Amino acid sequence: MRPQELLLLLLMLKWSLAHTEDPAFPHLGDSSQPLPRPCPWRCSCPRDDTVDCAGLDLRIFPDNITRAARHLSLQNNQLRELPYNELSRLSGLRTLDLHSNLITSEGLPDEAFESLNQLENFYVAHNKLSVAPQFLPRSLRVADLAANEVVEIFPLTFGEKPALRSVYLHNNRLRNTGLPPNTFHGSEVITTLSLSSNQLSYLPPSLPASLERLHLQNNLISKVPRGALSLQTHLRELYLQHNQLTDSGLDATTFSKLSSLEYLDLSHNQLATVPEGLPGTLTILHLGRNCIRHVEAVRLHKARGLRYLLLQHNKLGASALPKGTLRPLRALHTLHLYGNKLERVPPALPRHLQALVMPHNHVAALGARDLVSARALAELNLAYNSLASAHVHPSAFRRLRALRSLDLAGNQLTRLPEGLPASLRSLRLQRNQLRTLEPEQLAGLNKLRELNLAHNRLRVGDIGPGTWHELQALKVLDLSHNELSFVPPDLPEALEELYLQANRISHVGPEAFLSTPHLRALFLRANRLHMTSIRAEALQGLTHLRVVDTAENPEQVLV
């Protein structure tokens, strides 16, 4: 090297070093500061592999998306189509979210997916697709095409996907003709399939054997073909409610092979009997709103693990549940019989039953032993039946020592039942014909927190002295819509909410609430109060009071 060239090289090196250390030019020598991350306009890129363009009202696919993107969010925009060139170059995508756009099938090029050979999560729900993509990548794990207008699926839409676990197709327009027999061929680990709210007329054949959750509610299904559910031994939840199933559309083997089934919903169909072949693993059986008139014990004898049996709104009459029908159900926790035509409590209730819910029936009597077998009952609802005090045995409730909630609203009771258990927390007796309250009727209820006596015929003079004495835990007392002329005296000290609306109260004296220092809410609307009917001293000691309702009285009341 010639001396002149060497001198020039040394001068250049010196200049470079000087400017590298110059604080005025930190970007020239500071390698710790990364170059600006490429990101589409208005979008955010919180990480090198994430591009978030959600909710920007975009009408065209954004440009300048880095090839390094693994997660692309475009949901909640106005996109109608995806350009093949832009999408196909993003070959490293793992997640593509197109939820809630205006994308049509014509605007979603099948060819683009051939390049997305690492795509795992594909969300295109709430768009305008009329057919599914003919091909989706083999790498797919989750596919959500719900809430479109899809009428046809293709063999390679969901077939040959060894990693696919969840498919969502609910709220489309699928008929059975739009599902090829090999829809899920080669996809052997699918655990969740949602086909609800379509137009299927029978249960599709060749469903994946790996299924754990199958949603078929809100279709037109009238039949489950024989063997359609013979391989789904992992199925835990099956939803068939709101269809058109009849007894002839099921047979003894329909559910018998489902050896893992825990939840079966057949409500809102046209079944006249309980289905045969129920598996022993079943925990919840929902048969509400069918046409069932009779329950045969043999139909339940294998379902020994059943904990919740829901039979509300059927046509169960006086002999619908003969003695012994429920005996095999030793684990039964809850029995729903709401809205039938039962005239008595079912005999021989399971001993571990904790909730018996049967309002809106025709029950007219309660005998001494009607509930004796269900000593574990914690909730008993017999509201809106035809119970009269004369036909409720004094010992009907006496042995229910775990009972916490008793609802007898809407019956024909003229007095409180005798023998109420001390364990009660809630007692509902509204809309009866109660005329008297005596201390003996509420004796021992020192755990009661809520007492509803609304819509009866109670007068203050018919409430015996000391009636409230033992209700030491009472927080809520509803005496609305009775015939009270003033606030009942000596109310429970723990009381926090007092409902006295729609009575005949015309005056509230200074001593009215001396016994209730913890009162938080007081309702006196629609009485006979005038401007100065409430003495100022009446409310002075109520430091916790937050609500005083005196509307709809003859005059505006000063409080």
UniProtKB/Swiss-Prot annotation:
Its main location: secreted. Belongs to the small leucine-rich proteoglycan (SLRP) family. SLRP class V subfamily. Pfam families: LRR_1, LRR_8. Disulfide bonds: none annotated. It is found in: Secreted, Extracellular space, Extracellular matrix. It comes from Mus musculus (Mouse). Transmembrane segments: none annotated. PROSITE patterns: LRR (PS51450). LRR repeats lie at residues 66-89, 90-115, 117-139, 140-160, 161-186, 188-208, 209-231, 233-257, 258-281, 283-302, 303-328, 329-352, 354-373, 374-399, 400-423, 425-444, 445-470, 471-494, 496-515, 517-541. InterPro entries: Leu-rich_rpt, Leu-rich_rpt_typical-subtyp, LRR_dom_sf, SLRP. The gene is Podnl1. Keywords: Extracellular matrix, Glycoprotein, Leucine-rich repeat, Repeat, Secreted, Signal. This is Podocan-like protein 1. N-glycosylated.
